[in-house]
Design a protein with these regions (language model features):
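Primarily recognizes the serine-hydrolase "nucleophile elbow" in alpha/beta-hydrolase
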Residues: 103-162
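Serine-hydrolase catalytic machinery in alpha/beta-hydrolase-like enzymes
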Residues: 12-112
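A short beta-to-alpha transition loop/helix N-cap that caps and shapes the active-site region
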Residues: 76-81, 152-158, 175-176
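Short beta-strand/loop motif that positions the catalytic acidic residue
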Residues: 161, 167-169
Length: 186
């Protein structure tokens, strides 16, 4: 989908993250013509940063009448470098505790968007799946979490999850999931 699609308003947004790296920057998209307050989706990239593919996902969600936002975890280190291998190398330099705080700030940013309905869901891919799981353990009123792979939360944090989850994991990853109630449909 073209970045300049007339059906959408897109921009890069920045806001403070006092407990994280100080500032979060990411890609924001919403329908150009919407009626009423919209639900919001936090899109969390894999260990490659905010690349064109993730920006495309944000735009596609906006076409489905969501306000979507994808923070760039690599912003504190200069942002997505345009090269997937270099991006992966940069991930090793991130302070993960600060990065997690940045994603908590991003969830709060979306929750308080004036054009939003106050409900936030999160979808994360690979590394971002771990962030989606983390947010599910830390945000009691999270609307939903959809992790595609990613690190599982510690077993002691599973009981804190109140949001509906839709988890996509390969069979060998399921072995790492904490024991607990599960529902599986095929």
């Amino acid at each position: 989908m073209a970045p300049a699609d007339a059906r959408l308003h897109t921009s890069y947004a920045q806001f403070p993250s006092p407990d994280g790296y100080g500032t979060v920057r990411g890609y924001l998209a919403q329908p150009a013509k919407s009626k009423g307050k919209l639900p919001t989706v936090l899109v969390v990239h894999e260990n490659r940063g905010l690349n064109p593919h993730i920006e495309d996902i944000v735009r596609r969600l906006a076409l489905d009448d969501f306000i979507a936002f994808a923070p760039d975890a690599l912003f504190p280190l200069g942002g997505y470098p345009g090269d997937e291998d270099k991006a992966r190398e940069l991930f090793g330099k991130l302070d993960q505790a600060k990065t997690r705080e940045d994603f908590l700030a991003a969830e709060d940013f979306l929750k308080h968007r004036p054009e939003g309905n106050g409900k936030v869901g999160v979808v994360g891919f690979c590394w971002g799946g771990g962030i989606a799981n983390f947010l599910a353990t830390r945000v009691p009123d999270l609307g939903a979490a959809v992790p595609f792979y990613g690190a599982q939360p510690p077993a002691e944090d599973v009981a804190k999850i109140k949001a509906p989850l839709l988890c996509s994991t390969p069979a060998r990853t399921n072995a790492s999931m904490p024991a607990g109630p599960r529902t599986s449909r095929r």
